[in-house]
Swiss-Prot record:
Component of the small ribosomal subunit. Mature ribosomes consist of a small (40S) and a large (60S) subunit. The 40S subunit contains about 33 different proteins and 1 molecule of RNA (18S). The 60S subunit contains about 49 different proteins and 3 molecules of RNA (25S, 5.8S and 5S). GO terms for cellular component: cytosolic small ribosomal subunit. Belongs to the eukaryotic ribosomal protein eS1 family. PANTHER family: 40S RIBOSOMAL PROTEIN S3A. This is Small ribosomal subunit protein eS1. Keywords: Acetylation, Cytoplasm, Ribonucleoprotein, Ribosomal protein. PROSITE patterns: RIBOSOMAL_S3AE (PS01191). The modification N-acetylalanine is found at A2. Pfam families: Ribosomal_S3Ae. Its main location: cytoplasm.
Length: 256
């Protein structure tokens, strides 16, 4: 009888699973901090792989963009239809310091604004802020009935639409190009520009639902750590106190 390897006995058991490792064991949680214009500064948490070898966790976090509802940032449900984009520019400890990266409307809000019997007017302007951020702002507006109007429709003439669009462009250009990104964010939150357009176009055709529906960041200047820390209420300066010199007084020991 030939002595050989019994293939049946040497085979391993079928269906043996490899030892699974928890993927979250190699990850860390980092806090997301919103900049100064917003009321709620702690946005949430984000996961990232721990630093190992040549891979640094901070490099993986920088440049991440988070979309947050403005209602959560301002603690006001009236802003629920607007979404703010925040970009991670710096990581300090376990905190991601973010800056404003853009604004957008929810699709359901945009769809609810479009109705019959009215004209829709849109305009977009590319502007540069005083701190060299290149932005594109998209505005939207709708015509409304004049006081005591009997006619059902509120369609504006082509010449009126052109005049309104020209006015919208002028106001956006003026309001955005004369301020910093932080000041512009402060204007966007309470919709100052939209109200300004509505007021300025009353003589041409009355408008309603005037909004800056989208803000797109096209180009940003060279990264400034001091400016970012100022947005987050921190400072790069050394805040140690100065040494105060006092006159030396010799202590006289009393004789016992």
């Amino acid at each position: 009888m030939a002595v050989g390897k019994n293939k049946r006995l040497s085979k391993g058991k079928k269906g043996l699973k490899k030892k699974t490792q928890d993927p979250f064991a190699r990850k860390d949680w980092y806090g997301i901090k919103a900049p100064a214009p917003f009321n709620i500064r702690d946005v949430g948490k984000t996961l990232v792989n721990r630093s190992s070898g040549m891979k640094n966790a901070n490099d993986a976090l920088k440049g991440r963009i988070f979309e947050v509802s403005l209602a959560d940032l301002q603690k006001d449900e009236d802003h629920a239809f607007r979404k703010i984009k925040l970009r991670v520019d710096e990581v300090q400890g376990k905190n991601c310091l973010t800056n404003f990266h853009g604004l957008d409307f929810t699709s359901d809000k945009l769809r609810s604004l479009v109705r019959k019997w009215q004209s829709l007017i849109e305009a977009n302007v590319t502007v540069k802020t005083t701190d060299d951020y290149l932005l594109r702002l998209f505005a939207i507006a709708f015509t409304k009935r004049r006081p005591n109007q009997i006619k059902k429709t509120t369609y504006a003439a082509s010449s009126q639409i052109r005049a309104i669009r020209r006015k919208m462009t002028e106001i956006i250009q003026r309001e955005a190009s004369t301020c910093t990104l932080q000041q512009l964010t402060n204007k966007l939150i309470p919709e100052v520009i939209g109200r300004e357009i509505e007021k300025a176009t009353q003589g041409i055709y009355p408008l309603q639902n005037v909004h800056i529906r989208k803000v797109k960041l096209l180009k940003q200047p060279k990264f400034d750590l001091g400016g970012l820390l100022a947005l987050h209420g921190e400072s790069t300066t050394d805040e140690q106190g100065q040494k105060v010199e006092r006159e030396f007084k010799e202590r006289v020991l009393e004789e016992v």
